[in-house]
Amino acid sequence: MDVMNAFDSQAEDSPTSLGRSLRRRPLARKKLSEMVEEELEQMIRRHEFGEGEQLPSERELMAFFNVGRPSVREALAALKRKGLVQINNGERARVSRPSADTIISELSGMAKDFLTHPGGIAHFEQLRLFFESSLVRYAAEHATDEQIALLTKALEINSQSLDDNALFIRSDVEFHRVLAEIPGNPIFMAIHVALLDWLIAARPSVPDRELHEHNNVSYQQHIVIVDAIRQRDPDKADRALQTHLNSVSATWHALGKKSQKMR
C-alpha cells in the first residue's frame, strides 16, 4: 500500500482535522536577511570567498541582493555568530573558519537559561562529573612528564591563593583547565571552559569568610588527584576526582540554601 504524502491531492481532500489545520496555515516566509545569510553562507562553503578574504562592501551586497542595509547587516551578524566571518569597525567582513569556541558559544544562551530551570544546575554538575572523570583517567594513563609538571605548578598557585577567594577561584579554574588540555583536543577545551563559566555564573553570592574552609578542602583534594595521576592509577584518580566534585557540589548547594535563608 502506498504511503500518502501530506501535500499531494489526495491528502488535500482528506477530511482529517490535521489536513484541515494544515490548509488553514500559510507557510512562514523567510526574512530577506535570512535569505541573504543563507546565500552568503553557501558562497563561503563553496569557497567562492576563501578564508581570510574580505566580502564585498555593504553597498555592493545591497546592490547584488537588491535589499536594504539592515538586511545585509543582520545577515553579516548572523554569519559572525556562526564563526564564518569576522567584523571589525570600519572594515569589510572577512571570511573566517569556525572554531570549537564558536560552536560552543552558540549554545551559551540556551545553557544559561537551562541552568535556571529546576534541576538544571544538578544536570550540568553531573555532565561535568562524567566529563572530568574521563579527563583524569586519560591523564593518569597518558600525561607526559611536562604535563604533570604543569599540574604541579597549578597546585603551587592553588596553595598561594588560599586566603584570597578571587585568586583561588582563578587558580582552581586554571588547575582544571590544565587537566582538560592534556588530551590535546580543542573541542574538549571549549566544552570545559564553557561548562565552568556557566556553573560559576550560576553560583550564589556568599561572604568571603564562608569560602576559606572550602578553598583549603578543594586544594587538598587537588593534591590527591595529582598524586594519583603521578602514580599512573586511573581508578584512584577517578575516585579522587569524583570525591572532589561531589564535595564542591554539596558545598555550593549548602551555601546557596544558607544565602537564601539570610535574605
Swiss-Prot record:
- Give the superkingdom in one word: Bacteria
InterPro entries xref list = GntR_C (IPR011711), TF_FadR/GntR_C (IPR008920), Tscrpt_reg_HTH_GntR (IPR000524), Tscrpt_reg_NanR (IPR023730), WH-like_DNA-bd_sf (IPR036388), WH_DNA-bd_sf (IPR036390)
- Report the GO molecular function annotations: DNA binding; DNA-binding transcription factor activity
Q: Which residues form the HTH gntR-type domain?
A: 30-98
Region Disordered, annotated ranges: 1-25
Alphabetically ordered keywords of this record = DNA-binding, Repressor, Transcription, Transcription regulation
Question: Which Gene Ontology terms describe the biological processes this protein takes part in?
Answer: negative regulation of DNA-templated transcription
**Cited SMART domains:** FCD, HTH_GNTR
The feature table lists the DNA-binding region at: 58-77
Q: What is one Pfam family matched by this protein?
A: FCD
- What this chain does, per the record? Transcriptional repressor that controls expression of the genes required for the catabolism of sialic acids.
The family classification in the record reads: Belongs to the NanR family.
HAMAP family, per this entry?
HTH_NanR
Name of the protein this chain belongs to: HTH-type transcriptional repressor NanR
The protein's organism comes out as Salmonella typhimurium (strain LT2 / SGSC1412 / ATCC 700720)
What is the taxonomic lineage of the source species? Bacteria, Pseudomonadati, Pseudomonadota, Gammaproteobacteria, Enterobacterales
